[in-house]
Amino acid sequence: MLLAGPSGAGKTMLVHAICTELGATLFDLTATNIVGKYPGKSGLNMLLHLVIKVSKLLQPAIIYIDRAEKTFLKKVSKTDKSDPKRLKKDLPRLVRSLTSEDRVMLIGVSRSPWECEQKVILQSKASLIHSRNINLTIYRV
């Protein structure tokens, strides 16, 4: 699921409310949280393996990525040290590892989803939720 809306609209609060309501464990894979941790390709593979295994053990679980559009940017700013495209190749593997029986949800939050590669959004078959403060608009992509 992708939550999209302007800064301060309550997207992150909605994710926390979902976690609270479901009693779900939150795994935050935001690029700024994992920068410098689990270095290299093997480190990232280990991180994703741990997140998949532990999220399935602690169901219900939510895997959360803030500023998700940065993962799929066409061109990353040279000043951005968080290496946001690090998850790009491995994120589909994470999604494929989840089955319909798993109570694990991947939620991305974005201020500007139009900045990412449109092909990725169209291939994801995800729901796009656009929030303008309290009003929510749900689109099925």
Task: Annotate each language-model stretch with its function.
Residues M1-V141:
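Walker A/P-loop NTP-binding motif of AAA+ ATPase domains
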